[in-house]
């Protein structure tokens, strides 16, 4: 075979898990056309499991939904690759809800095409994948539930992206995804490269389901009627691009001075198109801790709140459960759009970076005093307690100068950076090695707390809204840090040192090249930047009678700003228009306490 033929042959590899004997692949047309069917059925849900799913160029795969089923779930152990055409067929029509679930990622190449009634692709964690795909005694996917309603509930969560996602998982699209209904892509990073096309406007697939070279059909599908099967479920016309990552894969990095990174990213490159007959939601979320899938952070009565109240409460309680361990962490959430996105309803672009280190200490042993930051120190001959935390948090939405975002109804850009650092260190309350020698060894409690939190929205391209246009950026910075040197029955010098360098910024930059296109008197325009900070730091020493003395030192530096730069106007008059920038310091408390002497330095910029 010539090298090109060998490469093409290697590129195509679809292998069924040997335990899934109900999945059948039948090939024809010189081994370029492949029909896939399954007998693994749970009510309206059918499933396949593959060790490999690589569709080569010029290869066409027709995936058949069994009679009376609406959902076809495909579990793939390795990275999914589509360089040919994949059709989901319900009867003789393109239709049904097609799912791809893998822990390793997915790529749709430049020649890749997926046609379905709806498509959901999720890149899960290894543990979640094993749970979802494992076979039960009934030869059904255990994670999809043994009852149909349980399976449907799990699939709904997949469509919403409310499943554990692999922090290293990536979905890349260079080709086309065509659907008549919902499209969901969920991973830690979503890349729509130049030439990518996502559309759920399709009703006629006759020019999409076959592989052609010019006007000639190279590989023909089994489709006899290419009209898509429409579904009437709520939100069926929505497109969700969800990138989410957490610190579950980074480890606690104890003893390390190397900062690790948690990154979520959505990219829509120049030359990429997203078109929806419903809503479009581009969402990026990155956080310190584990994403709260089970919503354990939500208080009782949450479901009775209004939508606006729920959003406010979610902002307050956060989306990630902190374990108090990730002290050196860079959390980054980013959405970059240089292509075209159009929505027949609402278009929402949301970026959230959440870096919360809560109740973190040197020893993680809290005193039963009711005080948040008092903790036990180390019980060693050398009574020292040193704590170092460095948190960087950044949320960015960037709309490039050739980007075009259009919504027939509301259009919103919302960026949020949320940094919360609760940290304390203390020498041991009782020195278990209290000897005449150790009485002369100084006790030292030292804490260094660094936090850099920023939220930014940059707009250089076109924004068109049929109703409301909203551009918001918010940065929340909350720090409580304490260093305490207090050892009973010790004459040793007690020293407490606290150094905190803190920065919080919120910026909106609308450049002169930007077009803010609104319909006259149809809606409101809001451009709002908010920076909120609350800082409490305390360095304290408690010395005993007859001690050699003590020193408490506190250096706290806080630098915050909030800016809106608007270098263009609106194309028409709005019902209401507001442009605001707020910088609010809710609390700034800096203390250095010592019964013998104290030294405190503060710097506020």
Regions found by a protein language model. Give the residues of each.
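Low-complexity, glycine- and small/polar-enriched segments
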Residues: 3-605
């Amino acid at each position: 075979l010539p090298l090109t033929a060998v490469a093409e042959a290697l590129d195509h590899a679809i292998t069924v898990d040997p335990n899934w004997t109900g999945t059948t692949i039948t090939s024809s047309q010189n081994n370029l056309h492949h029909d896939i069917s399954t007998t693994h059925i749970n009510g309206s849900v059918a499933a396949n499991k593959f060790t490999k799913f690589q569709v080569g160029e010029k290869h066409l795969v027709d995936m058949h939904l069994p009679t009376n089923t609406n959902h076809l779930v495909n579990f793939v152990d390795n990275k999914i690759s589509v360089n040919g055409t994949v059709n989901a067929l319900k009867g003789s029509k393109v239709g049904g809800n097609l799912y791809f679930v893998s822990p390793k990622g997915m790529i749709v190449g430049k020649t890749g095409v997926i046609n379905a009634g709806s498509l959901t692709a999720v890149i899960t964690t290894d543990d979640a994948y094993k749970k979802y795909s494992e076979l039960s005694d009934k030869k059904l996917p255990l994670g999809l539930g043994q009852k149909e309603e349980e399976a449907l509930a799990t699939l709904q969560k997949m469509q919403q992206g409310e499943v554990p996602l692999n922090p290293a998982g990536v979905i890349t699209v260079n080709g086309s995804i065509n659907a008549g209904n919902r499209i969901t892509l969920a991973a830690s990073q979503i890349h729509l490269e130049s030439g990518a096309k996502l559309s759920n406007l399709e009703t006629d697939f006759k020019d999409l389901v076959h592989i052609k070279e010019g006007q000639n059909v190279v590989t023909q599908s089994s489709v006899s009627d290419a009209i898509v099967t429409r579904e009437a479920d709520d939100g069926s016309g929505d497109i969700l691009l969800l990138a989410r990552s957490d610190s579950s894969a980074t480890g606690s990095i104890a003893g390390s001075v190397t900062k690790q990174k948690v990154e979520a990213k959505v990219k829509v490159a120049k030359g990429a198109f997203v078109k929806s007959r419903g809503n479009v939601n581009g969402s990026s979320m990155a956080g310190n801790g584990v994403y709260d899938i089970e919503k354990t952070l939500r208080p009782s009565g949450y479901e009775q709140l209004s939508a606006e109240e729920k959003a406010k409460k979610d902002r307050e309680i956060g989306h990630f459960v902190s374990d108090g361990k990730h002290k050196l962490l860079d959390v980054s959430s980013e959405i970059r759009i240089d292509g075209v996105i159009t929505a027949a309803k609402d278009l929402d672009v949301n970026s959230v970076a959440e870096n919360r280190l809560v109740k973190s200490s040197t020893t993680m042993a809290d005193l039963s005093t009711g005080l948040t930051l008092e903790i036990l120190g180390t019980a060693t001959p050398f009574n020292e307690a040193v704590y170092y935390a460095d948190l960087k948090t950044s949320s960015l939405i960037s709309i490039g100068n050739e980007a075009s975002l259009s919504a027939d109804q509301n259009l919103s850009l919302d960026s949020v950076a949320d940094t919360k650092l609760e940290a304390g260190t203390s020498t041991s309350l009782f020195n278990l090695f209290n000897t005449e020698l150790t009485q002369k060894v100084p006790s030292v409690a030292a804490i260094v707390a660094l936090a850099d939190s920023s939220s930014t929205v940059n707009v250089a391209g076109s924004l068109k809204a049929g109703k409301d246009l909203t551009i918001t950026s918010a940065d929340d910075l909350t720090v409580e840090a304490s260093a305490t040197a207090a050892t009973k029955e010790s004459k040793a010098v007690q020293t407490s040192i606290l150094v905190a360098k803190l920065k919080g910024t919120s910026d909106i930059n609308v450049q002169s090249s930007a077009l803010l296109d609104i319909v006259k008197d149809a809606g409101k325009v809001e451009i709002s930047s908010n920076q909120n900070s609350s800082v409490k730091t305390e360095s304290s020493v408690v010395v005993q009678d007859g001690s050699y003395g003590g020193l408490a030192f506190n250096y706290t530096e806080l630098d915050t700003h909030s800016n809106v730069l608007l270098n263009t106007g609106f194309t028409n008059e709005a019902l209401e228009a507001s442009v605001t920038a707020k910088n609010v310091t809710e609390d700034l408390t800096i203390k250095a306490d010592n019964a013998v002497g104290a030294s405190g330095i503060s710097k506020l910029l």
